[in-house]
UniProtKB/Swiss-Prot annotation:
Gene Ontology MF terms: DNA binding; DNA-binding transcription factor activity
Effect caused by changing residue 6 to A: Reduces DNA binding to the agr promoter
SUBUNIT field: Homodimer.
Source organism per UniProt: Staphylococcus aureus (strain NCTC 8325 / PS 47)
GO cellular component assignments: cytoplasm
Source species, domain of life: Bacteria
Subcellular location: Cytoplasm
Keywords: Activator, Cytoplasm, DNA-binding, Repressor, Transcription, Transcription regulation, Virulence
Keyword Cytoplasm: yes
Biological process per Gene Ontology, one example term: response to stress
Known outcome of mutating residue 82 to A: Abolishes DNA binding to the agr promoter
Induction notes from the record: Maximally expressed at post-exponential growth phase. Level of transcription reduced during exponential growth phase in hemB (delta-aminolevulinic acid dehydratase) mutant.
Protein name from the UniProt record: HTH-type transcriptional regulator SarR
DNA-binding region(s) from the entry: 51-74
């Protein structure tokens, strides 16, 4: 990624980002929060991560995080369970099949960016 040196660079970068997410919403029906979560899970060393950890690194408001996780669960891209240590904690996890599906999706998005 090139460095943003002035307002013109920032405006151009913002335009490209907005276009990417608009096109992604049309093609995959995924928004920024959902793509962020999928990418975060894919880059994670573990197949399990707490929703609190996702919230901490993303700074998403609880409502948006809950809504995004539920949608991704409904799309069968991830699964959720309650922590055995603390029932209030939601654990997000992916099976090998789900992780492969996420990898395929992220690869398609990255290919779109390159073109």
């Amino acid at each position: 990624m090139s460095k943003i040196n002035d307002i013109n660079d920032l405006v151009n970068a913002t335009f490209q980002v907005k276009k990417f997410f608009r096109d992604t919403k049309k093609k995959f029906n995924l928004n920024y929060e959902e793509i962020y979560i999928l990418n975060h899970i894919l880059r994670s060393e573990s197949n399990e991560i707490s929703s609190k950890e996702i919230a901490k690194c993303s700074e998403f408001k609880p409502y948006y995080l809950t809504k995004a996780l539920q949608k991704l669960k409904d799309l069968k891209l991830l699964s959720k369970k309650r922590s055995l240590q603390d029932e209030r904690t939601v654990i997000v996890y992916v099976t090998d099949t789900q992780k492969a599906n996420i990898q395929k999706l992220i690869s398609e998005l990255e290919e779109y960016i390159k073109n």
